[in-house]
Amino acid sequence: IRGTDSLNNMEQITIKNPAAGVYNLLVNGTSVPFGPQDYWLTYEYNYEDITLTYPIGGEGLVPGEFELIRWDAPQDSLPCVLEYTTDNGQSWVIITSSTSINTNFYNWQVPSVISDEVRVRISRNGISDESDANLTIVDVPNVSVSWICPDSIYVNWSTVAGATSYEVSMLGQKYMDSMTTVASNGNTTQSALILNPNPNVLDSWFSVCAKKNDSRGRR
């Protein structure tokens, strides 16, 4: 909130849309007990840059679900244009052209397509930013464990449209460790037999993510 501050000994002022030229700053002390007193002046420039902060690349999105597109930008009410591509930037589809830039987010319904060449772009007044790398849109398989033996584990899952392979992971000491990757065979269900790396562990966590070429979907 803009206003005069005569209480604190550190003050911030802003100049919106400054014109080119020379600026003079006059500093007057308020309730100074004795003087004169030294002071310091620092400044910075805030440009009209737009930074897309999500999705930035590598994410796995699910067709039909809602995702919050997020960005950082100057705080004004001018509209921005949000777009996405599913063919590595050869063509772009407009998501919206009427969202104010100062909302900093937009609730986007992910399109019902399968692609590993997806990016999101935001633009305004000739300034734009887009995802740093491609993201993937593909469904999430339903996974179950048929049986666990001291030496092996049998995992199966429902297949999803457009997947070229499936990555099976198991919880390690801290992270989900990739155990194997199985090529898609076109069936409605698939399975994998993996060696049990922790035969003394009585329970564990498993996940299966669909892959489109080398890109992972959500687990």
Where are these regions (language model features)?
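Recognizes extended acidic, P/S/T-rich segments that occur
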Residues: 90-106, 167-201, 213-214
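Aromatic/hydrophobic beta-strand junction motif of beta-rich domains
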Residues: 67-73, 108, 155-159
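Pro/Thr/Ser/Gly-rich low-complexity, intrinsically disordered linker/stalk tracts
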Residues: 137-162, 199-200, 214-219
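Conserved structural position at the C-terminal beta-strand
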Residues: 27, 122-124, 210
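Hydrophobic beta-strand segments within extracellular beta-sandwich modules
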Residues: 23-25, 118-120, 206
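C-terminal edge strands of extracellular/lumenal beta-sandwich accessory domains
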Residues: 1, 14-62, 137
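Conserved Ser/Thr-centered positions that define the repeating blades of beta-propeller domains
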Residues: 83-86, 123, 169-173
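Surface-exposed, short loops/turns at beta-strand junctions within beta-sandwich domains
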Residues: 17-19, 111-116, 194-203
